[in-house]
């Protein structure tokens, strides 16, 4: 079994080392193609305005000056002599939940793997950001191997990937695994305006107080309850339930 690893935090990220250890409990045929630098928040973007620079790091490990999407394409189209059986993207530092999956480079790595016809999973470790606070990587490292093996035996339809989020707690405090849907989360984004040394303004995006819908069955509720969240995601973003509604409205109107 061949596994391809990528992430959005970069080739030197601790979460990628965790993912390598997870993958090696499943197979010895592990390949890594990860961004040269942090690509967090770039979602499913391609690099089209500059060249992709590929750097061998060590045996079966490569750094690419590009996005997670670029990394998966480079691995499948250039580096590997055959497609991997599984793409794992992560382990991200911080959860990728609810609306956040649309921004996530970690989830995008799994999206691209799915587009390439490969079983793909995104893995993220929840973490409350604070100086000096440890990331509980051991939660993902302990629970992911068995979970991945189980999910590999599931006959998923084409165009479906799996988003895994591990709770921010001690290993022995994990309250189980729950199959979830995407929740709703407001990140409280605002614009932080500053002034440089020449008096010109510049800006940062700032995260504020997060407000979420913690209804039972959602990914954000599962993590709040110290459960591992397993969310199947589809590439087909068509809102099938609304198609007939729009079609009826158009038939009543003047659209040709």
Curated annotation (Swiss-Prot):
Enzymatic reactions: a ribonucleoside 5'-phosphate + H2O = a ribonucleoside + phosphate
All disulfide bonds of the chain are none
Provide the residue positions that the database annotates as binding a divalent metal cation.
Answer: 8-9, 40, 92
Organism domain of life: Bacteria
Which Enzyme Commission number(s) are on file for it?
A: 3.1.3.5
Query: Mind telling me which SUPFAM superfamilies this protein's record contains?
Result: SurE-like (SSF64167)
Q: Which InterPro entries match?
A: SurE (IPR030048), SurE-like_Pase/nucleotidase (IPR002828), SurE-like_sf (IPR036523)
Question: What GO molecular function annotations does the UniProt record carry, in alphabetical order?
Answer: 3'-nucleotidase activity; 5'-nucleotidase activity; exopolyphosphatase activity; metal ion binding; nucleotide binding
Subcellular location as annotated: Cytoplasm
Q: Looking at the keywords, is Nucleotide-binding present? A: yes
Might you report a single GO cellular component term? cytoplasm
Q: Which purpose does this protein serve, as stated in its record?
A: Nucleotidase that shows phosphatase activity on nucleoside 5'-monophosphates.
Q: Which family does it belong to?
A: Belongs to the SurE nucleotidase family.
NCBIfam families (alphabetical): PRK00346.1-4, surE
- Full protein name: 5'-nucleotidase SurE
Organism the protein comes from: Sinorhizobium medicae (strain WSM419)
């Amino acid at each position: 079994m061949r596994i391809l690893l990528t992430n959005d935090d970069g080739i030197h990220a601790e979460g990628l080392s965790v993912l390598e250890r997870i993958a090696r409990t499943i197979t010895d045929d592990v390949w890594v193609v990860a961004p040269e630098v942090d690509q967090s928040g770039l979602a499913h973007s391609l690099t089209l305005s500059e060249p992709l620079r590929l750097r061998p790091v060590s045996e079966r490990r490569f750094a690419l000056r590009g996005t997670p999407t670029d990394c998966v394409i480079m691995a499948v189209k250039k580096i590997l002599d055959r497609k991997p059986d599984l793409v794992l993207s992560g382990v991200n530092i911080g959860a990728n939940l609810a609306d956040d999956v649309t921004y996530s480079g970690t989830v995008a790595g799994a999206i691209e793997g799915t587009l390439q016809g490969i079983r793909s999973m995104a893995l993220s470790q929840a973490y409350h950001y604070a100086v000096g606070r440890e990331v509980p990587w051991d939660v993902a490292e302990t629970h992911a191997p068995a979970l991945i093996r189980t999910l590999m035996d599931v006959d998923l339809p084409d165009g479906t990937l799996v988003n895994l989020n591990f709770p921010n707690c001690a290993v022995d405090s994990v309250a189980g695994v729950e199959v979830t849907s995407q929740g709703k989360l407001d990140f409280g984004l605002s614009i932080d305006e500053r002034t440089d040394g020449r008096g010109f303004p510049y800006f940062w995006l700032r995260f504020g107080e997060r407000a979420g819908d913690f209804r039972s069955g959602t990914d954000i509720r599962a993590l709040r309850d110290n459960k591992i969240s397993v969310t199947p995601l589809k590439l087909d973003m068509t809102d099938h339930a609304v198609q007939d509604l729009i079609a009826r409205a158009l038939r009543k109107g003047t659209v040709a």
